[in-house]
Structures are given as structure tokens and as C-alpha cells.
Regions:
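Conserved nucleotide-sugar donor-interacting segment of glycosyltransferase catalytic cores
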Residues: 191-246
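A short, glycine/small-residue-rich beta-strand->loop->alpha-helix junction that serves as a flexible
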Residues: 51-63, 209, 323-325
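Histidine-anchored nucleotide/phosphate-binding helix
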Residues: 57-80, 221, 333-346
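Conserved N-terminal ligand/cofactor-binding loop architecture of enzyme catalytic domains
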Residues: 1-48, 70-189, 236-292
Length: 488
């Protein structure tokens, strides 16, 4: 079998699963269309997600579709706002592999036709605004970021999408970055006009969009909110095949947890079962398994650790992750926080700091172009005797590391909540979603962060408030099983 034949043979199962999946979706869509009976006089709900899938149905795309089916079967009219070559460039077709390639619009449209069989659809097709295009001509990246048009900060609206596509926070002033800004702003402006027309026509009672941060959904969210229309955003939950829906910011994962919510024995047991799997590395999120295996700390590490008074692990994030705009409150970005932390590390030679890169930082097909490994190399961090760096492809148990630590430092990673749950003191540099509750230490300024870190490092013992661990358990359970909806 030659290379071409082998390639075709390997693709057959993928093609088979793809078309079997489409057949199932089409069958279900027809059944829903046959059984859905809209309540007379009820206002519709608009669904829009242009940043969840292209040729294959993603989990977020499925969550949106299933939610729309549920509403239709309950008698609520639904209108799908659907892209049909509606942007000059979209986020999913603008990653590093295909910045300037033609977009796969035909494939995306074909899947939309299957998914929305028998549903009410309002499609939109792109047309460029000449005046806006002229205003955008020749701008630098800095000027794009600050760009406003007709009273709206389009540069800021598309900025998270550009960072996500470029896989970095600190953007370079190069052709691809300028092109993405230009095309995303032109597309966002067009979506706004089309969405305004749809709102005028349908007068919806609510709008449901994917995460609200990628520019197509962000501009739709803003347009609806200007009119006082409730907007629900959705993201993947922490449980497999679960979705988190909120009227706040989905990527910030804000929830309300009352003091009256206490775990029952059955709920405690359910949480323990989840934690047992989590601590073993047996979990997925958005269909991604971050840990193919999880190794214990080896003898060489333990021997090095024995030379120090204490161990403090430092957990980082992926710099372009959609949680970062919410986390960057005290510091401009995660690397600014690491720069500050490095100064603390240098004046505490008695402490072994273990800096851990996020396991998703170098994921195939989504590898970051601005990494913690680069920061470590640039700052000669591994030359420091009291630092061990664990890169993203080393599958060492973070939980064993936490158990051996005096306390832990995180930016805004979810492992901070798990550390609090294990009874450890946790110091956050970024605003994590769980930092809104009494679970961790989150200083409100860079100076306060340095002072808190110094105090924790010098303390002979750390008396963690008992409420931190109790709240961590309540919060994790609520996030997993109350705030998120199961779609399996």
C-alpha cells in the first residue's frame, strides 16, 4: 500500500463517522420539525453561533442546536441567524494554517442546511461598507485596537478574536495581524447591520449566542443588549457533554451561590467520585483529554525538593484563552504577572518554585505562539537554583505536587479551586471565576500581590480559613451539577 492509498484508507472511518453523524442530525431535525408547534402570539428566541464549527459539529454547536430543539418542542418559536458567506473572514477559518486561504464556506453552509432542516432561518451574506473600508485603510495594529466607528469600539470588540487566531496576547504589527483586524471589523459591522434588521423584524424575547467573546457573537450580543433584549451565552461545562449557560459572561463563568446551599451526603459522595477521577487525570473538557497519562513525581525531583525548606507550585494559563480578558484585572496579562513573580522568586532562595505550563499550551492544532517556555528561556529562569520548570507536555501529577506544597500560586487556572478544596492556601494573580467567593487569596494590586506572596513564604504555618475549603466544595459542586446543563 503506497502513501496515497494509506492516507485514503485512514480517512475512511473519519468520512464514515462524519456522514453518519449528519444523517442522524438530519433525521432528528426532521422529527423536531414535525412535532414542534409554536405557541400563537409568543415572541421568538434567536440563536446565533458562527464560531463553534465549520465542517464538523462541535460540542458547543451541538449544545446550541439541542437547546433550540428543546425550546421548539416546548412551543417557543426559534429563529436561527445563520452565516452564508456572511463574513469576509471568520475566526475558525483564520488560524495559522489558513490565514489567507479561501474560507470553507460551502462545507459550513452544507452542515447548516442539515442542522437547520425544517427550522426558521434568517441567513446573511457579506457586503463590504465602502466608507468603513476607507477608514480602515493603512492602519497599524495599535490603531486597529483603538479603532471606533459610529460610536462603537470595533477594535476592542474584535481584539479577543484576533488574539485567539494568532495564538498570542502581545500582537505583532505584521500583515496577517493587520489583515485579521481589517476583515474582522468589516465583518462585525456587517453582522451588526444584518442583526439589527432581524431584531426589527422578529422582536425577540431573548437571544442565545456562543460565549459572547468571539466577534460575531460579541457584536450580536451588544446589539441585542442595546435594546434591552436578554442575552444568554453558552460555553462548555467542566463535566463531559455539559454546557454552561448564563446571562452574564460565559467565559468568566460567573454564578450566584447562596449561603443556604449546603451539600447533602449524596452530593458529597458524588463530588468525591468526580474528584477521584479528576485527581487521576481521567477527565475531558470540550471533548479534549488533557492528560493521556499522569506520572508521579520522580526520585530526582524529590531529591532536589529535599534541599529546600518548602515547595510552592506556580500554575500558569494559556495566554490567548478566552478566560484571559476577565483575568487581566490586576496585571495587563499573565506574563506581566510572571515578571512580577520572578522578582519574588529571586529573594526566596529557601523555597523551591515549580512553574507548571498549562497542559493545553502546546495542544496539536492550537499551540500557543507565546508560551511560558519562551518566557522561561528569555528570562533564564532555569538557571535559578530554586526553580523547576515543567513544560506542557510533561504529564506529571499536579495534585501530588499540591499535596507536597506549602501553598500554591495560580494566575486564574481552575486548579486553584481544586487546591482550595484540598485545604491549601491559594494565591491568585489573575481574577479567577472562583475568586469572587471566599476560597482563595486575591490581592487587588500588584504591590498587594507581592506583599501577600512574601508573607505566605515567610510564615512558619499558614492558617487557611476553614470557610475556604467548605466554599470550594460547594462552589465546585454547584458549577458542575447546578449551573451547567447535561446534554448527554
Amino acid at each position: 500500500m503506497n502513501r496515497v492509498q494509506r492516507s485514503i484508507w485512514e480517512r475512511i472511518p473519519i468520512w464514515r463517522d462524519k456522514y453518519l453523524n449528519r444523517w442522524r442530525i438530519w433525521q432528528l431535525a426532521r422529527k423536531v420539525a414535525g412535532q414542534a408547534k409554536p405557541t400563537p402570539g409568543e415572541k421568538p428566541v434567536i440563536f446565533f453561533n458562527a464560531s463553534t464549527r465549520l465542517d464538523y459539529m462541535s460540542q458547543n454547536g451541538a449544545f446550541s442546536l439541542l437547546s433550540s430543539w428543546g425550546l421548539r418542542l416546548a412551543g417557543t418559536p426559534v429563529v436561527h441567524f445563520v452565516c452564508q458567506r456572511g463574513m469576509s473572514r471568520c475566526t475558525l477559518s483564520s488560524t495559522e494554517r489558513n490565514y489567507f486561504e479561501a474560507m470553507p464556506c460551502d462545507k459550513c453552509i452544507n452542515l447548516s442546511k442539515v442542522a437547520f432542516t425544517g427550522a426558521q432561518v434568517q441567513s446573511f451574506t457579506f457586503s463590504q461598507d465602502a466608507a468603513l473600508a476607507e477608514a480602515l485603510a493603512g492602519l497599524t495594529v495599535e490603531q486597529y485596537v483603538k479603532f471606533e466607528y459610529q460610536g462603537l469600539a470595533y477594535g476592542e470588540i474584535v481584539l479577543p478574536s484576533v488574539r485567539w487566531c494568532k495564538r498570542r496576547h502581545n500582537l505583532q504589527d505584521d500583515e496577517t495581524t493587520r489583515t485579521l483586524f481589517n476583515e474582522f471589523i468589516l465583518s462585525a459591522y456587517h453582522i451588526r447591520r444584518e442583526f439589527q434588521a432581524l431584531l426589527d423584524k422578529s422582536d425577540p424575547k431573548a437571544v442565545i449566542v456562543f460565549n459572547g467573546l468571539m466577534f460575531p457573537e460579541a457584536i450580536a450580543k451588544l446589539t441585542a443588549q442595546e435594546r434591552g433584549i436578554p442575552v444568554v451565552m453558552h460555553e462548555v461545562g467542566y463535566q463531559p457533554f455539559s454546557g454552561f449557560l448564563t446571562t452574564r459572561e460565559a467565559t468568566a463563568r460567573e454564578i450566584e451561590l447562596g449561603d443556604d446551599f449546603q451539600l447533602t451526603e449524596a452530593q458529597e459522595a458524588r463530588l468525591e467520585q468526580y474528584l477521584e477521577q479528576r485527581f487521576a487525570g481521567s477527565f475531558t473538557m470540550a471533548g479534549i483529554q488533557f492528560w493521556p497519562e499522569m506520572s508521579k513525581l520522580d526520585e530526582s525531583f524529590l531529591a532536589k525538593a529535599a534541599e529546600f525548606k518548602q515547595i510552592v507550585p506556580v500554575f500558569t494559563n494559556v495566554i490567548f484563552d478566552t478566560s484571559q480578558p476577565h483575568a487581566n484585572v490586576v496585571y495587563e496579562h499573565m506574563f506581566a504577572w510572571l515578571d512580577d513573580l520572578l522578582a519574588v522568586i529571586k529573594v526566596h532562595p529557601e523555597t523551591l518554585f515549580v512553574i507548571r505550563a498549562h497542559p493545553d499550551e502546546m495542544r496539536m492544532g492550537k499551540a500557543s505562539h507565546e508560551t511560558v517556555k519562551q518566557w522561561v528561556q528569555r528570562n533564564h529562569v532555569e538557571a535559578l537554583a530554586n526553580v523547576v520548570f515543567i513544560h506542557s507536555e510533561e504529564f506529571i501529577s499536579s495534585y501530588e505536587l499540591i499535596q507536597r506544597s506549602k501553598f500554591m500560586i495560580v494566575y486564574n487556572s481552575s486548579i486553584g479551586l481544586e487546591g482550595a478544596l484540598l485545604g491549601k492556601a491559594v494565591l491568585c494573580g489573575g481574577e479567577a471565576w472562583y475568586a469572587h467567593f471566599p476560597t482563595v487569596y486575591f490581592p487587588k494590586s500588584a504591590a498587594a500581590f507581592r506583599q501577600q506572596a512574601d508573607a505566605l513564604l515567610k510564615a512558619e504555618q499558614i492558617a487557611v480559613p476553614k470557610e475556604f475549603q467548605r466554599n470550594a466544595r460547594r462552589l465546585l459542586y454547584y458549577q458542575n451539577y447546578r449551573a451547567a446543563l447535561p446534554f448527554d
